[in-house]
């Protein structure tokens, strides 16, 4: 596509502007100009020579030539301005370069916020720099004091470059506070030795991963460091911080929130929540295209979640969840926790596919306060269960739990206080009625004359 007739003087002005900023006498063809603009870095070679206007006054060029030049200008100045060809020479002459070694936060066009330390604006992660901010390494007294606070909702991931590592930065308070759309932080090992992490990740509700190949923990101030990080899962054992977790959990290994990218033990399943009220839990990331999708998201199979806020049916969607199906591929996981999965889903009345699950460990609060009237565990192997704490608590409409006649809980390594709290409608297959005196996990067994329980063999 062409832009129509273009005055050659416009091209000469653009080329002269490039030559002036670079201090060169180079002759540029129209298609070379965008690359030449992108290559400008504030260096003046001291050999500027302007070229006169051409005798040919006009010509026709593809639209893409000027689109590319405009993109290159925006890549240099970090603005979103739309440039007409006649505006481009002035825009090039107006370019200024942020030079000198300093810590910068660079917002890239893919939503990455890169922190690095170089003598000029440049990206290691890759992409086009949209905006640049100088980082005050002495720290910030609030989130709003950060130079990059205005772009916090545009950040999809953060990258901390190795050039930061040797600077001795100790105060990272509020750095990632309220990055509500950020799912991961990479290069966290380059912040080893920080001492102040106050509200560093507060209200990062979509944050799943903080990657680090190593980390030296010297944190002494960490108030509300992980407050609201309901989806953050450590890569070793699925550890999930609480809203009050201190900086001591900022570590690799058991009980740590960090993940070594070279030793990530986590696997993920997906919850596809459809407009008809059903959620399908599956190992398949792609939802059913023939159904209207309300929400979708992934859940860590080994995640030791500590409350609500990690499922697609959380917040405003929760009351709309009426049925759940576990797909056949949910049996493919080597380890699976269902902690808080349907907690307080008060309209959830139907759950199918429990027999498709395998290697289930913790079912802490899994069905708490649901509206189910019966559950079918036939085909479910209980031998790996470790935790049934409040699993069915508050299921006041639950009348029947079916299981295979061979059902047997592990003889050790399992707990589950108040597993059946307030399940006042529940009756076992041999007629054992729920009692407030028998709410422990031990009653999750087949009801017989010699071993009363709340399960019905089928």
Positions of PLM-derived features:
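LRR flanking "cap" motifs
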Residues: 116-168, 271-274, 278-333
């Amino acid at each position: 596509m062409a832009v129509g007739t273009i005055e050659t003087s416009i091209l000469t002005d653009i080329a002269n502007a490039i030559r002036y900023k670079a201090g060169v006498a180079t002759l540029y063809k129209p298609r070379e100009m965008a690359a030449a603009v992108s290559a400008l870095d504030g260096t003046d070679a001291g050999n500027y020579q302007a070229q006169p206007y051409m005798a040919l006054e006009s010509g026709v060029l593809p639209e893409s030539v000027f689109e590319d030049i405009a993109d290159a200008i925006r890549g240099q100045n970090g603005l979103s301005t739309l440039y007409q060809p006649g505006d481009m020479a002035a825009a090039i002459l107006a370019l200024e370069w942020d030079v000198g070694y300093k810590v910068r936060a660079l917002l890239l066009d893919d939503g990455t916020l890169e922190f690095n330390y170089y003598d000029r604006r440049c990206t290691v992660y890759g992409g086009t720099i949209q905006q640049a901010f100088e980082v005050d390494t002495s720290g910030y007294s609030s989130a709003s004091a950060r130079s990059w606070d205005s772009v916090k909702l545009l950040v999809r991931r953060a990258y901390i470059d190795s050039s930061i590592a040797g600077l001795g930065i100790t105060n990272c308070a509020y750095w990632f506070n309220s990055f509500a759309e950020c799912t991961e932080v990479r290069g966290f090992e380059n912040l080893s030795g920080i001492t102040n992490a106050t509200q560093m990740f507060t209200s990062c509700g979509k944050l799943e991963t903080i990657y680090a190949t190593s980390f030296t923990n010297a944190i002494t101030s960490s108030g509300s460091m992980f407050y609201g990080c309901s989806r953050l899962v450590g890569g070793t054992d699925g550890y999930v911080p609480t809203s009050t977790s201190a900086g001591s959990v900022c570590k690799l290994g058991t009980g740590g929130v960090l993940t070594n990218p070279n030793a990530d033990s986590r696997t993920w399943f997906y919850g596809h929540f459809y407009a008809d009220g059903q959620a399908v839990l599956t190992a398949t990331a792609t939802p059913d295209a023939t159904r209207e999708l309300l929400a979708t998201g992934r859940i860590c199979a080994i995640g030791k979640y500590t409350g609500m806020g990690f499922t697609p049916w959380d917040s405003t969607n929760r009351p709309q969840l009426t049925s759940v199906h576990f797909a056949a591929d949910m049996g493919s996981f080597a380890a699976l926790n269902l902690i808080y999965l349907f907690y307080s889903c008060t309209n959830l009345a139907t759950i199918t596919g429990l027999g498709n699950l395998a290697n289930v460990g913790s079912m802490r609060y899994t069905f708490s306060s649901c509206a189910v009237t019966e559950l079918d565990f036939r085909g479910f192997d209980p031998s790996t269960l470790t935790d049934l704490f409040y699993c069915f608590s508050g299921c006041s409409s639950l009348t029947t739990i079916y299981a295979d006649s061979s059902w047997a809980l592990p003889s050790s390594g399992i707990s589950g206080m108040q597993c059946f709290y307030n399940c006042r409608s529940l009756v076992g297959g041999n007629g054992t009625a729920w009692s407030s005196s028998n709410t422990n996990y031990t009653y999750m067994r087949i009801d017989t004359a010699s071993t009363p329980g709340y399960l019905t063999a089928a």
